[in-house]
């Protein structure tokens, strides 16, 4: 893992793509992953503030992960939680567009709503957990 030769790097986000493009719902998500998630991640990487290393395609430096106590169990968005913990601890989080991981997207409206509710609720949990002041 070339990225982890740098002692400041704690995690690397990869390029998540939808593999099951089987209907309008999954095709829409495939487009969304390209435009929203991956373009946004490139911009956040340029600013040095990636907020989520996706569970589908992410690499974590073992020493950093152990220092932070492993994967958190108290939020629904453990990937986002751990990413924020890495940044808070002073680690750098990078993005590698050539590291591609295929994920299975929800293929029903009900499944999509459940996923997005989980993501939104998990984000709110992380905001509360890492609030300051």
What is the meaning of each model-derived region?
Residues 55, 95-96, 102-114:
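Catalytic cores of eukaryotic secretory-pathway lumenal/extracellular enzymes that build
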Residues 22, 46, 83, 103-105:
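Short secondary-structure boundary/hinge segments and terminal tails
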Residues 44-48, 97, 108:
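Short amphipathic alpha-helical segments at helix-loop
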Residues 25, 83, 93, 109-110:
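Internal amphipathic alpha-helical segments of the cytochrome P450 catalytic fold
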Residues 1-76, 113, 117-128:
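Long helical/loop segments within the catalytic core of UDP-sugar-dependent glycosyltransferases
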Residues 74, 83-101:
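Catalytic donor-sugar/metal-binding loop of nucleotide-sugar-dependent glycosyltransferases
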Residues 129-133:
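Hydrophobic helical membrane-anchoring modules
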């Amino acid at each position: 893992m070339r990225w982890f030769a740098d002692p400041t790097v704690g995690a690397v986000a990869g390029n998540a793509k939808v593999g099951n493009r089987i209907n309008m719902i999954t095709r829409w998500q495939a487009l969304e992953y390209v435009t929203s998630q991956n373009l946004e991640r490139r911009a956040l990487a340029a600013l040095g503030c990636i907020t989520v290393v996706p569970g589908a395609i992410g690499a974590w430096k073992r020493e950093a992960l152990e220092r932070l106590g492993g994967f958190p169990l108290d939020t629904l968005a453990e990937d986002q939680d751990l990413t924020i913990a890495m940044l808070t601890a002073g680690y750098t989080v990078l993005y590698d567009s050539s590291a591609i991981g295929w994920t299975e997207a929800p293929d029903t409206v009900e499944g999509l709503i459940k996923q997005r509710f989980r993501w939104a609720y998990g984000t709110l949990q992380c905001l509360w957990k890492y609030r300051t002041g």
